[in-house]
Amino acid sequence: MLLVIDIGNTNTVFGIFEDQKLVRDWRIRTKRNTTEDELNVLLTGLFTGSSVALADISRAVIASVVPPVERIYSAFCKKYLRCTPQWVSPANCAGITIRYANPQEVGADRIVNAVGAHAKYQTDLIVVDFGTATTFDLVSADGAYEGGVIAPGIGISADALFSHASKLPRVDLMTVPETVVGKDTAGSIKSGIIFGYAGLVDGIVSRMITERGRPHKVIATGGLAPLIAGVSATIEAVEPNLTLEGLRIIGSSAE
């Protein structure tokens, strides 16, 4: 079986593939001060009750945007999985051409999303990923990563508002407001964040398409993708497992 790991600034996602089937997946908070032994305890616990054991894992593919933990994950794979992990990089991206001025600047998560999206759709694409940052990545029909846009993420933007405005309460961002015009402070904040980000998405996507001069299919991934997609005029599909699928494809291409 293949273990895929997406190490993000906020969350780390683990997925287990048997051939092309995603068997299980888990999302945890990213810890920068963990050890390979703690990772073993954590994953052993996650696997308990599932049909998978650590001994079933023969390979690992990892995408990371958190350099301080990479040595720890490498040590875990070597010590407990008896394998050397495959790390996603511009030189290891399943045939995707990177047309960035400096390919080394492209985050592994963005590369993986491009791989997964191109494999599924084979057309001009814009991939919107709602993570710690909200990223917009343009992938051409011929499988090239053309570049993109990086904006502050929904979570960190909301945190900045709450931390700098003492009288504003924290609000639940997991549901869409019934109306744009809020009737109380909490409703007004929620409306501003959710509809504001939908407007940001639609505005940036529209500008990207205008600049390119032709239609692009727009897909979204990340934790809040279903929420924003529901009020966006441009997002056409939500792919919750896009990053894991991209990691699987990169792993398969190296066999």
From Swiss-Prot:
Coiled coil: none annotated. A monovalent cation. Ammonium or potassium. It is an enzyme of class 2 (transferase). GO terms for biological process: coenzyme A biosynthetic process. The keyword Lipid metabolism does not apply. One of its GO terms (molecular function) is metal ion binding. This is Type III pantothenate kinase. It comes from Desulfosudis oleivorans (strain DSM 6200 / JCM 39069 / Hxd3). The gene is coaX.
